[in-house]
Amino acid sequence: MDLGPIYNTRDINDGKVINIDNPNYTNPVAIKKNENNNAYQFNHLKTLGLYIQNTTYFTDNFIITGGLRYEYFDQVVGRSTLKNIRSGYLAQKDGKLLYQLGSVYKFTPNIATFFNHAESFRPQNNRTLIINGELPAEQGKSFETGLKYENAYLNATVALFNINKRNVAETVNVNGTNELQIVGKQRSRGIEFDLNGQLTDNLSIAANYTYTKVKNLENHNNKLAVGKQLSGVPKHQASLFLAYNIGEFDFGNIRVGGGARYLGSWYAYNNTYTKAYKLPQAIVYDTFIAYDTKISGKKVSFQLNGKNLSNKVYSPSTSGNASRTLIPVALGYAREVILNTKIEF
């Protein structure tokens, strides 16, 4: 049994932006105090959770796990002036009893099937100018089932999943003012494959493929959104990384590795769902070389990481639904080389 509070305070003040194509770092933009009534956004959130869980072995091959969890939150969210005078805010509290259930059946010592079901209860995170009435917590139900293979060297998993959410909130522009409103329901379903472990004593692998279909099931604000894929979620994602341990030498141990990540294409929409932009697919290559040794009897590790070796311009995500005309697109990092050093005392 676990009992514990979490308290989080966050204050945000929007400042000016710089030109990403021609940034000027030597003459930074002066940050001025904002005296407007709605200049500062705050979100004071307290959450409390209490759960109990039990695992039962019906046989050596059949295992069931069940649990109950009570989630409670106390939230004050809104906007304020520089002197912390609240110009518009919402105070609400709520709680819900959730349950989860899981099972595992082993066909052989190496092969098993599994099933999991869980519920979620999450308070809304408001960052808009106006709070339009109470914002009930987002609630979800998830189901997952699949097969798992595991031996002394490798483990592989294939799983089907389905996640339904309701009380989904969205920023809605009302007469030129952004409001956070409950708009409806969303669903995410797909299949995932994972492979991890040792191919040989020196060669390891980490591979993953995910197909995800995420769409709006219901949207009270805009009927055009129904059936559309959610922004920022490519249908196809995959990665493959290999690492090879070259071996021990008089001066230390050397490991090298590398691989690629694949992001499929997807559509991003403006807030009226009348305009769309197709984000192109991308393959990004990463690599590393690591060296472990001892200096004065202390373990020392050096690792040189190279990310996005081909300097590919790509988008890992989109914000989505920003305005009638703009579709914000986040850019992935450019080619990056990082050297990390660790000393164990």
UniProtKB/Swiss-Prot annotation:
Subcellular location: Cell outer membrane
Gene3D superfamilies: TonB-dependent receptor, beta-barrel domain
Coarse class of the protein's main subcellular location: membrane
Stated name of the protein: Uncharacterized TonB-dependent receptor HI_1466.1
A Pfam family that the UniProt record links to this protein: TonB_dep_Rec_b-barrel
Database matches in PROSITE patterns: TONB_DEPENDENT_REC_3
Domain TBDR plug: residue ranges: 1
Chain positions of motif TonB C-terminal box: 328-345
Organism superkingdom: Bacteria
